[in-house]
Amino acid sequence: MTQVKKEDIHVIIINCSSSYNLEKTLLTLKSLEGRIEDITILDEDHINLQINNYSLNKFIQRLKLIEEDIGTTLNNHIQKIECDYILFLNNNAFFTSNIIQKMLLLNDNHQLLTYKNLIKGEIIESPLLIRTSFLKNNKFFKKYQIPFKEALFSSWLSRIDKKVIKNVDREFVKHSPMGKSQFTSQKNEFISKYQNEAKSYESMPSISIMISNYNMEKYVEVAVNSCFLQTQLPQNIFVIDDGSTDNSYENLTNWIVYPEFKLLNTENIGKAKALNKVLECIDTDFVLELDADDWLDPNALEVIRGYLKSLSQSVALLYGNLRLWKQAGIQDVRYAGIRKGKPIFDKNELISYFFPLGPRIYRTSALKSINGFPVIEFKNGRMYEDVSIINKLIKGYQLSYRDFTVYNVREHNLSITKKNHSDWSDFLKYLD
């Protein structure tokens, strides 16, 4: 039986919405006073948290965010912590009177303690107590690797072996209301999918993912990471950097340690030509095209494979609905609705489609049978390559719309389609 030690816990308080709620959180720590070595409060610039007449003031230190990046800030801070455990209190969390010291212990088989919390209708599992040594070797994702900051803990938990996790059933952690919280129901619904169990896909159709990147260093790692944080992994993830002038390619090289990840680079040749280079490498049954600034739901491939297994051989493209988010700051997005797809059968219906058709899951053999993405004269194939390829496929194959939503579209100022919307009418003149 693990014995209680003195001063073996470092407390980290994150995302506290007011001074009142901070005081409430701190007061409930008094029952742990003998075990607390330090208390770190993560200061976010938009909140001025005050602490008045609190007996544990001697333990408290403030920590400023590094470049608005919670993951990086925590990773750096944790490397300096020497005590056995780190206790996370996030989103106005506090202990109830039911807390007992022996519940905040881990035996030799467990590395972390979690609890389940009901947030706006979704049950979210959250880390509570983690061995410091384990955290030093299992770092949190950086801000440009997760879609929004609220996904930090759930995305981290999703890659941890369930065998080392102890979940506490008793309700001894609660949360004060967040007020105008950034936790929308849509974000919580997304986050809850990180908790889905991994599923076998040995007998399912094989699928690769291809991403063409140009100067999307702020977003492309979110796209890549979303391919790995899946309940069913893809066979391969191909990323081609199309001559970026930012730090995209350098950042992408960090992912080559994963065997499924394949990184290519080229001078700036445009998206159609870049994707054709990737297509030469693909040998799976299907390939999903993921834009470098978009991302997938954690169960996306599980859902998609479910449709692919019964897809007619005459179908060259499977697509569904799109979930739209608007960029609102460095690490925040706001839900902007669902773009519901519809069946299309000919060129006229294709060009009258009000938004990009997606997600686009191509039958690889069909793509190769028409020699890949057309490089038309308009902009040398650098725009509307999705419409060009679908227009070519629809002449000899069927398209299949199914009502599913697993693909997240990011609207932001760097979006090429948004910037060049007026070119659409000119593009149509080149479409045969």
Model segments located where?
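A recurrent flexible, glycine/aromatic-enriched loop bordering the glycosyltransferase active site
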Residues: 112-130, 343-361
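Short aromatic/hydrophobic "clamp" motif used to bind/position activated sugar donors
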Residues: 86, 287
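Conserved donor NDP-sugar-binding/catalytic core segment of glycosyltransferases
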Residues: 93-121, 301-332
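Acidic donor-binding segment of Leloir-type glycosyltransferases
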Residues: 29-65, 224-264
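Glycine-rich, basic loop-to-helix element that forms the pyrophosphate-binding segment
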Residues: 66-80, 266-282
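N-proximal low-complexity "stem/linker" segments adjacent to membrane-targeting elements
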Residues: 1-28, 173-226
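Catalytic beta-strand/loop signature of glycosyltransferases that borders the donor
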Residues: 164-172, 321, 400-406
